[in-house]
């Protein structure tokens, strides 16, 4: 009998063990679909990005025109650009859902998988930020100026860091060139870290909605979950293509249709919607260094989740007090996102400050206290 090539060939065997015969808990729900959706988002972004890079010119005098040229003169250039710009939004929607699921079902207890996931989030945020600068519109230019200027808050070496990032004494041609280089390179770094993320995941096995060991009840990934993932792809691509075709600029900023002008400041400088929660936390502290530290902590606090877990149960499902806190925490970034999109004036300042305090208090203080209390109530 001839050996099964899928199981004997060195390369095919790796693919087979990761995507076909992978033992998967039989009861994982639709919340486990977001990992594969993130993979397809990354693939889509790399493909559309490579096509856009072929027509883009990383020069301050030509960048805006080259983007306009791509949309007007390149065959289906408008569609490729719209898919790339809105694909970034869907990428962040998927990753926020993915993190939320990990938080709710206690997946952060797989420490290595969780920590590489947080590194992936930080890399994705860096990639999206440098990408937003490339069209060289007003919001691109001023967003780059404001955010890179935050490095000046670093004691002693701050100003040198800023000038090193800019490649001069202001945001100019060298800045755009290095941002384009980073935006081209980082997605491949994300792909590499994703492989590490999956290696750690397959080492421990996937979590499940019951939070129990599922070794006795596993089924092959294909065809059961591969078909389920294809349904997920369809459910994601339908709204993405609808948005790209019917309302491509819905999530963008009108200021970015104006070429960058260093002499005219927009009335309200703000990043893309998926960064607004962190931007609101940055703005809530009135001095620069404190704001920068809070901005960094808003994402890096996720590294502490495995250390702050005090419950004897893995899941939040059977812990009503923790559930209440979880859904309060879920509502919090929506409030921060709304505040971040508003001008810096009363009452948005105080709302942002209260929401920022609530965000850190829930994660760092209330979750551990509540979990300890629940342990005592359940007599663990």
Swiss-Prot record:
InterPro entries: Cyt_b/b6_C, Cyt_b/b6_C_sf, Cyt_b/b6_N, Cytb/b6-like_sf, Cytochrome_b, Cytochrome_b_C_euk/bac, Cytochrome_b_N_euk/bac, Di-haem_cyt_TM. Gene3D superfamilies: Cytochrome Bc1 Complex, Chain C (1.20.810.10). Its cofactor is heme b. The keyword Transmembrane applies. Heme b b562 binds at residues 84, 183. One of its GO terms (cellular component) is mitochondrial inner membrane. The chain crosses the membrane at residues 34-54, 78-99, 114-134, 179-199, 227-247, 289-309, 321-341, 348-368. Binds 2 heme b groups non-covalently. Keywords: Electron transport, Heme, Iron, Membrane, Metal-binding, Mitochondrion, Mitochondrion inner membrane, Respiratory chain, Transmembrane, Transmembrane helix, Transport, Ubiquinone. Its main location: mitochondrion. A ubiquinone binds at residue 202. Pfam families: Cytochrom_B_C, Cytochrome_B. It is found in: Mitochondrion inner membrane. Heme b b566 binds at residues 98, 197. GO terms for biological process: mitochondrial electron transport, ubiquinol to cytochrome c. Component of the ubiquinol-cytochrome c reductase complex (complex III or cytochrome b-c1 complex) that is part of the mitochondrial respiratory chain. The b-c1 complex mediates electron transfer from ubiquinol to cytochrome c. Contributes to the generation of a proton gradient across the mitochondrial membrane that is then used for ATP synthesis. The cytochrome bc1 complex contains 11 subunits: 3 respiratory subunits (MT-CYB, CYC1 and UQCRFS1), 2 core proteins (UQCRC1 and UQCRC2) and 6 low-molecular weight proteins (UQCRH/QCR6, UQCRB/QCR7, UQCRQ/QCR8, UQCR10/QCR9, UQCR11/QCR10 and a cleavage product of UQCRFS1). This cytochrome bc1 complex then forms a dimer. Heme 1 (or BL or b562) is low-potential and absorbs at about 562 nm, and heme 2 (or BH or b566) is high-potential and absorbs at about 566 nm. Belongs to the cytochrome b family. This is Cytochrome b. It comes from Colius striatus (Speckled mousebird).
């Amino acid at each position: 009998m001839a050996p099964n090539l899928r199981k004997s060939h060195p390369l095919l065997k790796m693919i087979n063990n990761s995507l076909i015969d992978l033992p998967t808990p039989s009861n994982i729900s639709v919340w486990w679909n977001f990992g594969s959706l993130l993979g397809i988002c990354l693939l889509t972004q790399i493909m559309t990005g490579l096509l856009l890079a072929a027509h883009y010119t990383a020069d301050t005098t030509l960048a805006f025109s080259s983007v306009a040229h791509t949309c007007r003169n390149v065959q289906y250039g408008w569609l490729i650009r719209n898919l790339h710009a809105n694909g970034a939004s869907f990428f962040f929607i998927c990753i926020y859902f993915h993190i939320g699921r990990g938080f709710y079902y206690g997946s952060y207890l797989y420490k290595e998988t969780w920590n590489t996931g947080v590194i992936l989030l930080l890399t994705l945020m860096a990639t999206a930020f440098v990408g937003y600068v490339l069209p060289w519109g007003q919001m691109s230019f001023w967003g780059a100026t404001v955010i890179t200027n935050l490095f000046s808050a670093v004691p002693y070496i701050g100003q040198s860091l800023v000038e090193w990032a800019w490649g001069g004494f202001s945001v100019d041609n060298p800045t755009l060139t290095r941002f384009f280089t980073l935006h081209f390179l980082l997605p491949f770094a994300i792909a590499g870290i994703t492989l590490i993320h999956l290696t750690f995941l397959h080492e421990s096995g996937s979590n499940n909605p019951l939070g129990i060991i599922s070794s006795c009840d596993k089924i092959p990934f294909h065809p059961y979950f591969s078909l389920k993932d294809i349904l997920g792809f369809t459910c994601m691509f339908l709204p993405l293509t609808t948005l790209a075709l019917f309302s491509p600029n819905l999530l963008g900023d009108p200021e970015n249709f104006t070429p960058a002008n260093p002499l005219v400041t927009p009335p309200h400088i703000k990043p893309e919607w998926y960064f607004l929660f962190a931007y609101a936390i940055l703005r809530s502290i009135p001095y620069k260094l404190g704001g920068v530290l809070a901005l960094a902590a808003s994402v890096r606090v996720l590294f502490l989740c495995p250390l702050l877990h005090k419950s004897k149960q893995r899941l939040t499902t059977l812990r009503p007090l923790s559930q209440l806190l979880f859904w309060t925490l879920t509502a919090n970034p929506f409030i921060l996102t709304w505040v971040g999109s508003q001008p810096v004036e009363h009452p948005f300042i105080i709302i942002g400050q209260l929401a920022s305090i609530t965000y850190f208090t829930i994660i760092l203080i209330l979750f551990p206290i509540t979990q300890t209390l629940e342990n005592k109530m359940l007599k663990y």
